[in-house]
């Protein structure tokens, strides 16, 4: 089979105006970026949000990620194509924008694979419509303005060593995790320690993805916690007056981007916070617009149900015009065998015992989603090396738990690789059985929220806190911020905070190292284990395989 980029480059794209027309968007509603992508303008956004139509929302999540691959984005796109082209339903796919840094590192892109991709894949994975660059500029402008305030005046007496804002770059660069700025003479600024986070891990990315409009964006930026004064008082961006300028930098990036799949299903691709260190979902602007424009909306949550899935149900859905009508859990035979074996060496060999053992991981993810009182289905992403016996066994194991399972081949066959699965998903979404039950109550304090997520979703025995975390929790209580939702930063590879504990581990405690207020995003990040907000590059970065010819044709992107 040809590479993803070869398949994408051979596909004849439809003009973006034709894609828009499928969901009743007119030419004047668009701000085109070339022939194949466009932003939806504010006039259209404001008009669409006033209509009463609300489609069905289908959330796609998965088992715990493994090096064997799960293909969640591929399934989301293929399922959307199947609903649109095989069942002939009005459908929109809402996905996150990929971060450029990991494209050159290890993870790869987020545009699907094989015959189930969104296009133009090179643009989406690299510069796209410039949203990531706008975010990076906004992040670093804010950092520069704060440093300049301290250098020029500092009438609020901000402590340079207690600035909480990080600089940003959409590049994997471990050397920037800890730096010192303002070195040398005072002419270069006030010397203090600082750090970079990858753009998508910055609070401004979360704010962009949660804001409803420019006024909300501006208010949230103003509420961002800059740091503390020498006498322990919190300082917010609005006290310094920078929110208008930063919102101006992001006003265009706030508008969702319209593209298409290989099979010309409309897709909104907008925003991209990581799910292990942020909330892991595309913008609420895009999802809400999709709900008002189409009958069925497919969106995905980053990583497994314990990370993106939990955050979507308990946090993101509170910002949407409706909660999910159905949940899809993506699984593969290979990934479940990896959960049992802990190695990729023999995944191509039939191993029913390993599959039975690894199934415990899927079972927990299924039950996690079921605990939210939303109908659940499992889609098994078939690989060429899967045997019929393995697929039959996995289907049987799932259905013994009272949940339907369907084998799909969207990667190899596009929308034709799972029409029956698409119908089953539609049946669930139309069943009217979804009535979301949250993991915690909104008025629970920080520790109660953490404990409920840890015990109900991760299946931990309890929670342990460092002295530093205890002090930070007291600080948040002191400034009245201890009732906000919590976003737990945790490894994606395990239900625990130890990435080596595969399968469905028990007998462990969750170890909380620290908590930090993201006041503009209106949540508290709870740090566990060793989670980095600035990735590094591997020994053999994907960049070594990427090239471009003299005609501008890119190769090596997956």
UniProtKB/Swiss-Prot annotation:
GO molecular function: ATP binding; formate-tetrahydrofolate ligase activity
Pfam families: FTHFS
GO biological process, any: tetrahydrofolate interconversion
Keyword ATP-binding: yes
Positions with a binding annotation for ATP: 66-73
Domain of life of the native organism: Bacteria
Keywords tagged on the record: ATP-binding, Ligase, Nucleotide-binding, One-carbon metabolism
Protein's pathway: One-carbon metabolism; tetrahydrofolate interconversion
Cross-referenced Gene3D superfamilies: Domain 2, N(10)-formyltetrahydrofolate synthetase (3.30.1510.10), Formyltetrahydrofolate synthetase, domain 3 (3.10.410.10), P-loop containing nucleotide triphosphate hydrolases (3.40.50.300)
UniProt cross-references to InterPro entries, sorted A to Z: Formate_THF_ligase (IPR000559), Formate_THF_ligase_CS (IPR020628), P-loop_NTPase (IPR027417)
EC number: 6.3.4.3
Annotated catalysed reactions: (6S)-5,6,7,8-tetrahydrofolate + formate + ATP = (6R)-10-formyltetrahydrofolate + ADP + phosphate
Similarity comment: family membership: Belongs to the formate--tetrahydrofolate ligase family.
NCBIfam families: PRK13505.1
Protein name, as recorded: Formate--tetrahydrofolate ligase 1
Organism, as annotated: Lactobacillus acidophilus (strain ATCC 700396 / NCK56 / N2 / NCFM)
Encoding gene per record: fhs1
């Amino acid at each position: 089979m040809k590479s993803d980029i070869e398949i994408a480059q051979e596909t004849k794209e439809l003009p973006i105006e034709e894609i828009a027309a499928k969901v009743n968007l007119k030419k004047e509603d668009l701000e085109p970026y070339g022939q194949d992508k466009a932003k939806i303008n504010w006039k259209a956004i404001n008009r669409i949000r006033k209509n009463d139509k609300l489609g069905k929302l289908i959330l796609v999540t998965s088992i715990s990620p493994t090096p064997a691959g799960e293909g969640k984005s591929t399934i989301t796109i293929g399922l959307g194509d199947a609903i649109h082209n095989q069942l002939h339903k009005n459908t929109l796919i809402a996905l996150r924008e990929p971060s450029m840094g990991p494209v050159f590192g290890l993870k790869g892109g987020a545009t699907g694979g094989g015959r189930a991709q969104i296009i133009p894949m090179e643009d989406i994975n690299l510069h796209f419509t410039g949203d990531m660059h706008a975010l990076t500029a906004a992040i670093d402008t804010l950092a520069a303005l704060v440093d300049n305030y301290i250098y020029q005046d500092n009438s609020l007496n901000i402590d340079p060593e207690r600035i909480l804002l990080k600089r940003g770059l959409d590049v994997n660069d471990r050397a920037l995790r800890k730096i010192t700025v303002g070195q040398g003479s005072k002419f270069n600024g006030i010397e203090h320690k600082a750090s970079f986070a990858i753009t998508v891990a910055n609070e401004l990315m979360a704010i962009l993805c949660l804001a409803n409009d420019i006024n909300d964006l501006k208010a949230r930026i103003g509420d961002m916690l800059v740091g503390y004064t020498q006498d322990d008082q919190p300082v917010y961006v609005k006290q310094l007056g920078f929110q208008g300028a930063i919102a101006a930098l992001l006003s265009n990036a706030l508008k969702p981007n319209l593209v298409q799949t290989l099979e010309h299903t409309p897709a909104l691709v907008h925003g991209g916070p990581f799910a292990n260190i942020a909330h892991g979902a595309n913008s609420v602007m895009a999802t809400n617009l999709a709900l008002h424009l189409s009958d069925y909306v497919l969106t995905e949550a980053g990583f497994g149900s314990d990370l993106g899935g939990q955050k979507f149900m308990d946090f993101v859905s509170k910002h949407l015009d409706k909660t999910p009508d159905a949940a899809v859990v993506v699984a593969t035979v290979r990934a479940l065998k990896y959960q049992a074996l802990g190695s990729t060496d023999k995944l191509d060999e039939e191993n029913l015992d390993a599959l039975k053992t690894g199934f415990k991981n899927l079972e927990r993810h299924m039950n996690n989603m079921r605990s939210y009182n939303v109908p659940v289905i499992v889609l098994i992403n078939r690989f060429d090396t899967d045997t019929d016996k393995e697929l039959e066994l996995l289907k049987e194991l799932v259905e013994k738990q009272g949940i339907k399972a369907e084998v799909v081949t969207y990667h190899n066959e596009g929308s034709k690789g799972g029409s029956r699965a698409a119908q089953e998903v539609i049946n669930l979404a139309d069943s009217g059985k979804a009535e979301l039950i949250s993991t915690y109550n909104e008025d629970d304090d920080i520790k109660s929220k953490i404990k409920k997520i840890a015990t109900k979703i991760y299946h931990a025995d309890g929670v342990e806190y460092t002295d530093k975390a205890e002090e930070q929790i007291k600080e948040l209580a002191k400034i009245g911020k201890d009732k906000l939702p919590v976003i737990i930063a945790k490894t994606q590879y395990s239900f625990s905070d130890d990435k080596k504990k595969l399968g469905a581990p028990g007998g462990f405690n969750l170890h909380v190292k620290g908590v930090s207020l993201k006041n503009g995003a209106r949540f508290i990040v709870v740090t566990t284990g060793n989670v980095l907000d600035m990735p590094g590059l591997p020994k053999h970065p994907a960049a070594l395989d990427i090239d471009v010819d003299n005609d501008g044709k890119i190769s090596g992107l997956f």
